[in-house]
């Protein structure tokens, strides 16, 4: 998602060509079929990330970019009746699907959902025990990523934790990374996420 006029882009990382309004419209449009497109392929990495987060009963956990709500539901189960999960997503239609999912599972009372921008989180300082992002950080243009992470730092407890599942250029990406970049370069409206240096951004 790009609304920034800055030219300070990281070498080797592709630009985000869509504006935030275009990104919102895209996810509003595909909300009904998103699970068919991504749920199966994203699940293994999502579950690995959730194990790292190690959510405990009674905690306050934030998910940024919650989509159709499957992760929120798992987090709501993990925090139990004494905890709370919070979610922010740019898409109103995704938010509606997530609310329906949580309601159907009897978990809506443990959740608070917002439709908005992660560059300006509507939560108080030191209010979260943990933050989870799954294939969300790479949707932001390079100059905007530090803004998102600064907001994460603000709302986290000093000893809080953040887990980011991302398409990362670090490690052994090989053909998968090249495939993501080729698709993003030629079909940015279909492949809106692109590989980033996720670990470096979090340091």
Residues of each region from the PLM?
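Conserved alpha-helix/loop element of class I SAM-dependent methyltransferases that forms part
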Residues: 40-57
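Class I SAM-dependent methyltransferase SAM/SAH-binding core
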Residues: 62-120
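A short acidic, Gly/Pro-enriched loop at the edge of an enzyme's catalytic core
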Residues: 119-131
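Conserved beta-strand signature within the Rossmann-like core of class I S-adenosyl-L-methionine
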Residues: 159-166
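Short alpha-helix
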Residues: 190-203
